[in-house]
Regions:
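A composition-driven surface/loop motif
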Residues: 2, 9-583
Length: 583
């Protein structure tokens, strides 16, 4: 029986918005300009980036050529290949070069337990309607190399799998029961009409290759691990996840399984469900570009079967949303306005006048000398209006009512997420980045850690729910974070903001330290960095802690409030506010 990974647990949050919803997405030119007697002021909901600034992966389709000629498998290993009709079987360790057109056939590896096999794709097309076109039944490790300056394709033409389908003939277009490595400087197009695109039951690694994977379910899956070192990868999932691991156990050497590791490359992920779904963790470091579009932000998404009380129920989907969205008008109060008789950030009083620092060039003010930027000065009158982008898909003014009973997050891990590099762009109808701490969720029987750590990198998120959500703890030590749109920008029980530049736009709370396990007292702790928070009209807070707020450094700017002249709490706490440094 086949397990369809597109079946998702119910993970829809019940959220109600009380204002006109903004976009969850990647709109071009979403900086708002308002005009009043005091002149023109630019209010930024984060620093919106033009989509033309996004670096996308090179598409393997750009190198497509017609594959002709007889199919051949050559090797210097004698008696290493057998042929039965259109099925070619590699039985020994060695290097095998594949060329030509194989229609309705298979390339199978069935070697010894200790054998390492290298398959060189040297201009080939393999199509099969009865099993995985490339099927590794047994070996120690298989390396598939796309030869430089060649175009290659693998097409699984089987009818889409069901719950009763067998995986005896392979569960993906390229399917391996052992470690699988994709390498080479050529191009490879993989189409998985049956279930997954590329899958290893152990570790899957990708280096250098230009690869485009389109699958009805998961595009790229390594049960134990996925490791992307370099290359250009486009992963498209019509009904599942883009990049996925599923095993969170420990290896025989006590190494943690279930981690997606990305250290280089240009990667585009289009997924109906999660962009990256890790059974344990996600580690991203180094230089590269990662773009993720989920649910209605992926033009490739189709109807998804959801689990819950009715596992067989199909959830209808609206047409996919364009990455650029239309704008709704939202009223708000500029940070530089003088508000009288309005509740202040700490439980009453006026919001002082002054001018917000100029950030029109997208740069935070210089605080290298330890001093906060000068905000003295007067402002004109109240400023309202301005365009805010509109929500995608089936979001509407009643709240986050997408109706999905499956997860559509950008990056999701059952335990921890660590980011130390990369330029990341996420457009998701669910949380942009999410770490779980569910009880006993790991195969070791342990709870997930529920932690997110940002050490460096540039992250831009447009989310229909939370920008970043950690069940336990969120640490930002450095880097650039731009939550262009969200319901709540940053959310965790413990939020430590130690450095970097952080821009947040939220329709509810910008930064929220929430209750959770009943053991940890929620806290927002600011020790450094530049934090710019904008919230929409209504009952919203720039910073909301269900426990305490502590600031010993950094610069915090909160903009938000109401078109009627009232502003919600800049900082709203259930505990205490302690400020001994910073601004």
């Amino acid at each position: 029986m086949i397990k369809l990974n597109k079946i998702k647990r119910n993970c829809v949050a019940a959220v109600i918005l009380t204002m006109c919803l903004m976009t969850a997405g990647c709109a071009r030119n979403s900086t708002s300009t308002t005009t009043a007697s005091g002149g023109e002021t630019t209010i930024t909901s984060g620093i919106a980036k033009d989509d033309t600034d996004v670096t996308h992966a090179d598409d393997a389709e750009n190198y497509r050529v017609a594959i002709t000629g007889d199919f051949t498998v050559t090797s210097d290993t004698s008696d290493g290949v057998t042929q039965s009709g259109s099925v070619y079987t590699i039985t020994k360790a060695g290097e095998y070069t594949v060329t030509g057109l194989l229609s309705e056939g298979q390339l199978i590896v069935d070697a010894g337990d200790e054998d390492e096999v290298t398959i060189i794709l040297n201009g080939t097309s393999i199509t099969c309607s009865s099993g995985s076109p490339i099927y590794v039944k047994n070996a120690s490790e298989v390396k598939i190399k796309s030869e430089e300056n060649t175009f290659n394709e693998v097409i699984d033409n089987r009818t889409e799998a069901t719950e009763d389908s067998s995986d005896d003939a392979g569960n993906a277009a390229i399917y391996a029961t052992c470690d699988l490595k994709l390498v080479g400087k050529g191009s490879l197009v993989v189409t998985g009409n049956y279930n997954n695109g590329i899958q290893s039951k152990d570790d899957l690694s990708i280096k250098n290759v230009i690869v485009k994977v389109t699958a009805v379910n998961n595009a790229v899956k390594g049960n134990d691990a996925v490791d992307i070192e370099s290359g250009n990868i486009i992963a498209i999932s019509a009904k599942g996840d883009g990049i996925k691991t599923s095993n969170s156990s420990l290896s025989n050497k006590d190494n943690q399984k279930g981690i997606v590791t990305i250290t280089g490359g240009n990667i585009d992920v289009y997924a109906a469900c999660d962009g990256i779904d890790a059974a344990y963790g996600v580690d991203i470091s180094g230089d590269g570009n990662l773009n993720i579009y989920t649910d209605t932000y992926s033009e490739y998404s189709e109807e998804v079967t959801s689990s819950g009380s009715s596992p067989s129920t199909s959830t209808g989907r609206d047409s996919s949303a364009n990455k650029t969205a239309s704008a709704n008008t939202v009223s708000y109060v500029a940070a530089s306005d003088t508000i009288t008789n309005a509740p202040g950030g700490f439980g009453g009083g006026n919001m002082g006048g002054g001018n917000a620092p100029d950030m029109s060039n997208g740069n935070a003010p210089d605080m290298s000398n330890g001093n906060a930027p000068d905000m003295n000065g007067s402002s004109g009158g109240n400023k309202t209006g301005g365009d805010r982008p509109g929500m995608p898909g089936d979001f509407n003014e009643s709240g986050n009512s997408s109706g999905q009973s499956y997860s559509t997050k950008g990056i999701k891990a059952e335990s921890e997420i660590n980011i130390s590099g990369f330029t990341i762009n996420i457009c998701s109808t669910d949380d942009g980045i999410h770490a779980n701490s569910d009880s006993g969720v790991l195969e070791t029987g342990e709870d997930g850690k529920g932690t997110i750590v940002i050490n460096s990198g540039s992250i831009t998120i447009s989310s229909g729910d939370d920008g970043m959500h950690a069940d336990k703890q969120l640490d930002v030590n450095d880097g650039y974070i731009n939550i262009v749109t969200s319901y709540e920008g940053l959310e965790a029980m413990t939020i430590n903001l130690n450095g970097g530049k952080i821009y947040v736009y939220a329709t509810d709370d910008g930064i929220n330290a929430c209750t959770g396990d009943g053991k940890t007292s929620p806290i927002v702790n600011v020790t450094g960095g530049y934090i710019d928070v904008t919230t929409a009209s209504g009952d919203t807070d720039g910073i909301d802690s269900n426990g305490n707020y502590v600031q010993t450094g950094g610069f915090v700017l909160v903009k938000g409030g109401s078109s009627s002249g009232n502003v919600s709490g800049s900082i709203d706490v259930d505990g205490t506010v302690t400020i001994t440094g910073g601004t």
